[in-house]
A protein has these predicted regions:
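Conserved small/polar residues in nucleotide/adenosyl-binding loops
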Residues: 205-211
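N-terminal targeting signals for export/organelle localization
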Residues: 2-50
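Short loop/turn microsegments at loop-to-beta-strand junctions
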Residues: 48-49, 71, 171-173
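Structural microenvironment flanking redox-active thiols in thiol-disulfide oxidoreductases
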Residues: 88-148
Length: 215
């Protein structure tokens, strides 16, 4: 009887997996789920949908290249003179923090692809000294980018989820995605404190999840 009790206690202890310090997000209203990683595999159904666009080097960039990586995404345009320079400066801080880590990536999507062709993105990358080894600037179909931003990345939260692609997309949000394509954070890309929190979250997520992903 005593042995059975000890076995039951052991099994109970093994079943109690720790709750993640970094929340999971499943809906565009960004309700946080502080659950264990094991529970998230069954509870969190939302994943970033597959995508493919051209980067600043004129190469086709496919989301499958992000498999097994933690990445940070934002939405900018090269002619933006208000929030985009600040957002790029803060993204540079993230790039610097993980410049030697091949399991962390940054992705910036242009929201004015009719202006921002690969040549424009290349000039932008040169201006801000962006390394294409871990930071990709992407352009492509406006409709594809806008749909991906609003319905996969929840870039404009609930208010923008069902907007038509004819409505201009402009957001300061930076979105953190884990190795399994799940959203783990949303930050104001113009605020240094938010950037610090994002860097901490990237570090935590990178170290605590296995590098198995379906993007």
């Amino acid at each position: 009887m005593k042995n059975c009790w000890l076995i039951s206690l052991f099994l109970l202890a093994c079943s109690e997996t720790p709750v993640s310090k970094i929340p999971y997000y499943n809906t565009p209203d960004f309700t946080p789920y502080f659950i264990s990683d094991a529970e998230a595999d069954f509870t969190i159904s939302h994943r970033i949908k597959p995508f493919s666009f051209f980067n600043q080097d004129s190469s086709l960039f496919e989301s499958k290249s992000l498999q097994g990586k933690v990445y940070v995404a934002n939405f900018i345009f090269t002619r933006c003179s208000n929030i985009c320079p600040d957002m790029t400066t803060q993204m540079k801080r993230i790039e610097k923090a993980f410049h030697s880590n091949s399991k962390v990536a940054l992705v910036s999507f242009t929201v004015t692809p009719w202006f921002d062709d690969v040549k424009s993105l290349h000039k932008f990358a040169d201006k801000y000294q962006i390394s294409s080894s871990n930071w990709s600037l992407l352009t492509g179909s406006k409709e594809s980018i806008y749909t991906l931003a609003r319905q996969s990345f929840f870039a404009e939260e609930s208010i923008g989820y069902n907007k038509d692609s004819k409505e201009f997309l402009h957001t300061e949000h930076v979105v953190l995605v884990d190795q399994k394509g799940r959203i783990r954070g949303i930050y104001n890309g113009t605020i240094p404190l938010d950037t610090e929190q994002c860097i901490e979250a990237v570090s935590y997520t990178h170290l605590t999840l296995p590098t198995i992903c379906s993007v």
